[in-house]
Amino acid sequence: MSNVVTDPTNSKIQVRDLNFYYGKFHALKNISLDIEKNKVTAFIGPSGCGKSTLLRTFNKMFQLYPEQRAEGEILLDGQNILTDSQDVALLRAKVGMVFQKPTPFPMSIYDNIAFGVRLFEKLSRADMDERVQWALTKAALWSETKDKLHQSGYSLSGGQQQRLCIARGIAIRPEVLLLDEPCSALDPISTSRIEELITELKQDYTVVIVTHNMQQAARCSDYTAFMYLGELIEFSDTDKLFTAPAQRQTEDYITGRYG
C-alpha cells in the first residue's frame, strides 16, 4: 500500500491493523489508514471489495449481527471504539450514517428531524423548532420544506428524501458523517445537489463517503482510498491518486481495465 498522506496530528479516525470477518470469511485484511478531520475521504473499488464493510465499522453497525466481528483498532479521537466498553448509542450520536437508499421515517418532515434529537436532548419547542430549521438549512432543504413541515417525509422527491436523511443525521450534531453510496438511487440533478452539500458539510464535519462513481470521488473528496478484495491498495490525496496513481492495480481500476 502506498503511504498514508493525511496529517496524523489532525486525524479524527485512526484505523490500525483492522481485520473483519463475516463468519469465517475474511472480508477486511490488515487495514490501516487515518481519516483527517474536516475533510472528505472517499472509498472506491469494485463491488465486494470491502469499502462499505469498512465504513460500517466506524459506528459498529456490525454489532447487530452476531456472526460478524472486527479485530484491531479504530481510534476515534484517540479512543478505541472496538472495545466492549464502548457505548454504542453514544458512538452513533457522534458518528452519523446515511444509507444508499433514502430512508425517511413514516412521520412528518419535522418529526423526522426531531426524532433523533429527542433521544439525546430535552429541548423546548422553540429550541426544537430552531434545531429543525438549522438542520434543514444545513442540508439545503429548508426553502423547499418550510411551508410543509408537517407533511409526510414520503411526500418529498427521492433527492429531497436523501437530503432529509442527511438533515436528520446532522440534527444530533455528530462529529463524523458516513455516507454509503448516497447518490446511487438519485437522478443527475439530485446527485449534483448532494455533491455540493458534501463539500459544504466538511466545514463542520468529518465526512467519509463510499461511492462506485469515480468521478464523484474525484469531485467531492480530499482523500481517496482504493480497495480490492478486502485490501487497501492505495490511499492518497485524491488529485494524486487519479492523476498519478502509485499502484498498478489503482491505475487499472481508474482507467477501466477491470472492476
UniProtKB/Swiss-Prot annotation:
Q: Where in the cell is it found?
A: Cell inner membrane
What are the recorded Gene Ontology BP terms? Answer: phosphate ion transmembrane transport
Q: Name one GO cellular component term.
A: plasma membrane
InterPro entries, from UniProt?
AAA+_ATPase (IPR003593), ABC_transporter-like_ATP-bd (IPR003439), ABC_transporter-like_CS (IPR017871), P-loop_NTPase (IPR027417), PstB-like (IPR005670)
Query: What molecular function terms (GO) are annotated for this protein?
Result: ATP binding; ATP hydrolysis activity; ATPase-coupled phosphate ion transmembrane transporter activity
Documented EC number(s): 7.3.2.1
Q: Where does ATP bind?
A: 45-52
Span of domain ABC transporter? 13-254
Q: Which reaction is catalysed here?
A: phosphate(out) + ATP + H2O = ADP + 2 phosphate(in) + H(+)
EC class of this enzyme? translocase
- Principal localisation: membrane
Q: Which SUPFAM superfamilies match?
A: P-loop containing nucleoside triphosphate hydrolases (SSF52540)
What membrane topology is given?
Answer: Peripheral membrane protein
Keywords, comma-separated and alphabetical: ATP-binding, Cell inner membrane, Cell membrane, Membrane, Nucleotide-binding, Phosphate transport, Translocase, Transport
Family under the similarity heading: Belongs to the ABC transporter superfamily. Phosphate importer (TC 3.A.1.7) family.
Task of the protein: Part of the ABC transporter complex PstSACB involved in phosphate import. Responsible for energy coupling to the transport system.
Query: What protein name applies here?
Result: Phosphate import ATP-binding protein PstB
User: What is the protein's species of origin?
Assistant: Edwardsiella tarda
Gene this protein is translated from: pstB
